[in-house]
Amino acid sequence: FSYLHDRFNESFNIATDASKNLSFFVKDDDAIQCINERKRVLLKKFDQFGYDYHDYSDYINLMRNTLINIEDIDYINFENAFRWQQELQAVLETETNDLAKQKDRLKESLVDCDQYNRYEKEKEIEKIDDLLSLTSNVGLTDFEMSLLSNKVLIIKGEAGTGKSQLFANETAKFISSDRKVLLLLAGFYADSRSLENQIMEQCRLNFDFEKLIDIFESIGEVERRFVPIFIDALNETWNNGLWKQALPRIIKKINDCNYVKLAISFRSEYERQILDNKLINPKNNPNISYIVHNGFENNTEEAVQAFFNHYGIKFPLEYFLEYKFDNPLFLTLYCKNYQGDEPNLPQLYDRILAKADQNLQCSLPDVFKNNGYTEYDRIVYNLIICICSWIVKNGNKYIDKESLIELSFWKEYRLPLQPIIRELEREKILYSYPYLD
């Protein structure tokens, strides 16, 4: 977790659509609570209908009594939620058909209505539509059912949307619940050997990856619970094209299991570098679930307010909505580097570079100590200035990997390129992406 730096905050997490979907995929306590809460929300809604729905009280009471008699789910009987909607519809079949016929009659009678009667009848049609839609608010959606049944989940998203936070937070939840889980950080894999071998080397295990999956399958079978494997940030593997060959092998092995699940994440623009053509199209892979992590896109205001409260920032919320605060990483960096003064992005970036210098030297202490450097030497700042000078000189908006390797900075400062670049990508000081014509 410490290696993720600002990409994971164990004590502070904001729920997103992606985190809800991941909960269903691994069948954790949050997913169980979400399903049971849907039933309670619907029961509360019945109490809010009031006198306007008096004519439909028989239908409402029948649905209420049926719901009350449906037991809450837990991990063992989770699949019962698959049947909640069908159970309700079966009990209400006669009454539902009667309501549908009543709605049809009302619609037919609208033809010869005056304005007042039309308004009243349209209100009744609206009430019937509300009642008929209620059964869809319990149990599981089709997508949630596919998440539960599928063994592989592919997550993509823009930089900083919270993919690492997503996996790390889920891993932390599993650990706190004494459940088995494996989180792998793809940025550790730095050579051209098979990725399965590199994974096992990083895990310090002297047997093959398939054997590790077999062990997890045995554990899951004994505990009767899923054991998820999360592989985060596939794009950060130094030779990330290796995943094209490795993923089909790994997915084939996972699909042979009953209790092991695999979830992977990467930046969207790397999709064609990482996935082979067969894996890219969801329509060709009904047994694989696909989601896009959009950060706080659907709850930006709630997230910003929570972040400002957490970091003690008192400025009015509206003042900050001009920034890209639907991106969790940017919001985190902003809050961590905010010092109570007037917002100033150049000043913010300077603070971020200073913080990156500290983190870089904490992550690679021997590299810097052996060369006599401290955080006050502003290594990150000097590297960024060197890159900017190259960009200005060459008239580009980016620097390619070959030119980055050839910068005079590396000889001048006597520092190794690969570990420093890897760390600066993790710090989001450098942003890499595949160049496409």
Regions found by a protein language model. Give the residues of each.
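Conserved P-loop NTPase "ATPase switch" module shared by AAA+ and STAND
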Residues: S218-K244
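The conserved phosphate-sensing helix
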Residues: L321-K336
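Conserved small helical "lid"/interfacial subdomain of P-loop NTPases
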Residues: Y270, K278-L317, L353-Q361
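Conserved Walker B catalytic segment
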Residues: L234-A263, K278, L415, P419
